């Protein structure tokens, strides 16, 4: 079982089958941001799609069985990490897909797909709805727990916020054994999370070790002293 990583929204006005052109991506950047926030919140809550971790949703004016269904194109044997699902929509709705007004109804379609195909007792409707609601109402202020470390009577939590510009804005908080906040600091905005690998924690300081990369220069660790 893989934790969800991303949700991507596409559109098409031709049947999405093998041999046809692939569905189009949106230039509606706000919609992409919202979909990724939803995926982040679902992942924080342990949500899994099964044996894949990217969910692609194609909004189409073509007929779809029961209006929501797995794509007729089928799974890609060379890219098993994603699956496509389709939602039938009207032409007037299709014409709004590059406007801000489409975001809420598109997220309602996303919720319907999650409920229909991925809702199990562990991921009940309330959890799915709460994650989507948090992403919509909190936006760039939504905190998603990314990493946590407990040691020496301290607890360090690294949160992520996903900004409207498509960058992550991490937040570090350190608590004592009574959950009293000892340290809170914003970390630099970033496009990638390579700088945030493991957390080392003692009574006096917290250090965030970067992920090791074979393809890029490893950034320096980030160290903060606890008051």
Question: Can you say where each PLM-predicted feature lies in the sequence?
Answer:
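Surface-exposed loop/turn elements that mediate protein-protein interactions on large endomembrane-trafficking
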Residues: 122-138, 170-189, 213-227
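Acidic, small-residue rich beta-repeat scaffolds with periodic aromatic anchors
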Residues: 1-112, 193-227
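Short coil-to-beta-strand transition motifs
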Residues: 148-154
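Structural core positions within WD40/WD-like beta-propeller blades
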Residues: 154-158, 207
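Short, surface-exposed coil-to-beta transition loops
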Residues: 167-170, 194-195
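Long amphipathic alpha-helical scaffold segments
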Residues: 99-147
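Repeated scaffold domains used in trafficking and secretory/extracellular systems
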Residues: 140-148, 189-200
């Amino acid at each position: 079982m893989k934790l969800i990583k991303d949700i991507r929204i596409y559109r098409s006005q031709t049947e999405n089958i093998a041999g046809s052109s692939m569905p189009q991506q949106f230039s509606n950047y706000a919609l992409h941001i919202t979909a990724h926030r939803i995926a982040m919140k679902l992942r924080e809550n342990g949500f899994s799609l099964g044996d894949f971790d990217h969910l692609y949703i194609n909004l189409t004016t073509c007929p779809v069985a029961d209006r929501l269904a797995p794509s007729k194109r089928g799974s890609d044997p060379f890219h098993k990490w994603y699956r496509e699902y389709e939602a039938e929509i009207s032409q007037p709705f299709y014409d709004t897909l590059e406007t801000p007004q489409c975001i809420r109804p598109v997220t309602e379609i996303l919720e319907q797909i999650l409920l229909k195909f991925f809702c199990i007792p562990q991921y009940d409707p309330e959890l799915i709805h709460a994650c989507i609601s948090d992403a919509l109402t909190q936006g760039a202020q939504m905190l998603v727990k990314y990493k946590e470390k407990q040691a020496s009577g301290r607890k360090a939590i690294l949160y992520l916020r996903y900004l409207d510009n498509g960058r992550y804005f991490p937040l570090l908080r350190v608590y004592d054994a009574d959950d009293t906040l000892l340290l809170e600091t914003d970390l630099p905005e970033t496009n990638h999370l390579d700088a945030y690998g493991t957390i080392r924690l003692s009574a006096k300081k917290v250090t965030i070790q970067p992920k090791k990369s074979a393809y890029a220069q490893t950034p320096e660790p980030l160290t903060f002293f606890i008051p």
